[in-house]
């Protein structure tokens, strides 16, 4: 199987527009392409007789804050005819939008909105690029590695005001909970054990 994927990868690199390279790892083919040519590359992968990747299964982002091109946009494709899966990766930074692939795969609409909402990756030409999982007034992008784990605001329902309120996050004091299980056979003495003897 990996030999067939290696041959397919070599064929795609030789003939597809904008492809920079390929690799096969753990039985999966990964193609790396230029972000500017992602529409042409995906159109080739969909329409070429040797590929026939007619389904876009998923589109997501990956954050590498130490790189200049911080984000990878990863497209997972499936060919039911050839019984192959493929991964296409393109890199971009925080300011450079990636062309929207909704003209090639309409299902990418909500996937791109999710990548925008969670990572802040912009998609040029998207028909409706707005938040999909977080509130409209939400600040930041929660799946970025520099986003604080506590977030910026706390959202709760206030019974007195009868509405949802947003408050700055308050870090509570650190508490260590030591739950001792009597079934684990503790060998040390606890306060009050002297009374039992």
UniProtKB/Swiss-Prot annotation:
Superkingdom, taxonomy of origin? Bacteria
* Stretches that traverse the bilayer: none
Which Gene3D superfamilies does the protein's record reference?
Answer: NADH:ubiquinone oxidoreductase, 30kDa subunit
* The UniProt record lists the keyword Protease: no
> What is the protein's quaternary organization?
NDH-1 is composed of 14 different subunits. Subunits NuoB, C, D, E, F, and G constitute the peripheral sector of the complex.
The task this protein performs is described as:
NDH-1 shuttles electrons from NADH, via FMN and iron-sulfur (Fe-S) centers, to quinones in the respiratory chain. The immediate electron acceptor for the enzyme in this species is believed to be ubiquinone. Couples the redox reaction to proton translocation (for every two electrons transferred, four hydrogen ions are translocated across the cytoplasmic membrane), and thus conserves the redox energy in a proton gradient.
Protein family per UniProt: Belongs to the complex I 30 kDa subunit family.
- The protein in question is named NADH-quinone oxidoreductase subunit C
Q: Which organism is it from?
A: Caulobacter vibrioides (strain ATCC 19089 / CIP 103742 / CB 15) (Caulobacter crescentus)
What is the name of the gene encoding this protein? nuoC
């Amino acid at each position: 199987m990996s030999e067939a994927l290696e041959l397919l990868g070599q064929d795609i690199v030789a003939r597809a527009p904008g492809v920079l390279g390929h690799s096969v790892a753990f039985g999966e083919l990964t193609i790396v392409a230029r972000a500017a040519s992602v529409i042409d590359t995906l159109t080739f992968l969909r329409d070429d007789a040797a590929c026939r990747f007619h389904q876009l299964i998923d589109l997501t982002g990956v954050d590498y804050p130490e790189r200049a091109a911080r984000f990878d946009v990863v497209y997972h494709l499936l060919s039911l005819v050839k019984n192959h899966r493929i991964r296409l990766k393109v890199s971009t930074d925080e300011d450079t939008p990636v062309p929207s692939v909704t003209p090639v795969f309409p299902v990418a609409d909500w996937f791109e909105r999710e990548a925008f909402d969670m990572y802040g990756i912009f998609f040029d030409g998207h028909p409706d690029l707005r938040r999909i999982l977080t509130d409209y007034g939400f600040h930041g992008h929660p799946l970025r590695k520099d986003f604080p784990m506590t977030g910026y605001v706390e959202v709760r329902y206030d019974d007195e005001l009868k509405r949802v309120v947003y408050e700055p996050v308050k870090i509570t004091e650190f508490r260590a909970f030591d739950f001792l299980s009597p079934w684990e056979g503790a060998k040390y003495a606890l306060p009050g054990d002297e009374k039992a003897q």
